[in-house]
Design a protein with these regions (language model features):
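A glycine-centered loop/beta-turn motif at secondary-structure junctions
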Residues: 196-220
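N-terminal beta1-alpha1 cap of cysteine-dependent amidohydrolase-like domains
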Residues: 1-92, 100-106, 112-118, 125, ...
Length: 248
């Protein structure tokens, strides 16, 4: 996919203990031909990005709770302002945990139900892709995608009222499922409520998911389903006048 507008520019936040930032940057630069900047968590300037990425890892060693310290990093004020203005933000794994701790997404991520760290390829069913055209516009409801997971605290939980609200608003966008797209207990790797693997905020511009799309963006490493999220972003940005008019 080639943009006629300037290349997308993404900022990847870096916290002490995260490590997926370089995977995201590699995909952005080498696979997609985008610009990617790694910005340390103490900074307050996101450097005029088109999108912001919160990567996976163990920010601050996951002390207290996953993401509990990272949410207070200076960069998060800038991320919150960017998201409030409608800017697209994605948080994968630890990034999802940080988004939840910061209040940008509801609910929390807890220890896996079986108390084991899970690192494997996982099948997921796409739900309500229209709720997030920026991140899921290239995916179709009901289809099954395959992304890797790598977490010990990925069990999504929320109170019943919040879960019902998310469901009713179409904000549950990914569920753990088997290869046939059936959401079952056996297909759920961590015990997440209602098999939830990914959700979006009310505007749909902030996506949190436990799987790692950046690790499924090259055929050589096992699959390219993750690349479709970035293609969705690229197409969405291409349609925005502010991006088309930007001069690098």
């Amino acid at each position: 996919m080639t943009l006629t507008a300037p290349r997308p520019r993404v900022t990847v936040a870096v916290f002490p203990g995260t490590w997926s930032e370089r995977d995201f940057a590699h995909v952005a630069r080498a696979v997609l031909g985008w610009e990617a900047r790694l910005v340390w968590h103490t900074e307050t300037d996101l450097v005029a990005p088109d999108a912001v990425i919160l990567p996976g890892g163990f920010a601050h060693g996951d002390h207290l709770r996953t993401g509990a310290i990272a949410r207070f990093s200076p960069i998060m004020s800038a991320v919150e302002a960017f998201a409030s203005a409608g800017g697209p933000v994605i948080g994968s794994c630890n990034g999802f945990q940080i988004l939840a701790e910061a209040g940008l997404l509801p609910g929390a991520l807890m220890r896996n139900e079986h108390l084991e760290f899970r690192c494997d390829w996982q099948t997921l069913r796409v739900e309500s892709s229209s709720s997030s055209p920026a991140w899921l516009g290239e995916l179709k409801d009901g289809e099954v995608v395959r992304l890797p997971i790598s977490h010990g605290e990925g069990r999504y939980v929320a109170d019943p009222a919040t879960l019902d609200e998310l469901e009713a608003a179409g904000r549950v966008v990914l569920r753990y499922a088997d290869a046939d797209g059936q959401v079952t207990d056996d297909a759920n790797p961590n015990g997440s409520d209602r098999g939830i693997a990914g959700i979006v905020n009310e505007r749909g511009n902030v996506l949190g998911l436990m799987p790692h799309p950046e690790r499924a963006s090259e055929a050589e490493v096992g699959g390219t389903d993750g690349l479709r999220l970035f293609h969705s972003l690229e197409r969405w940005l291409q349609a925005r006048p502010a991006v088309a008019e930007r001069r690098l």
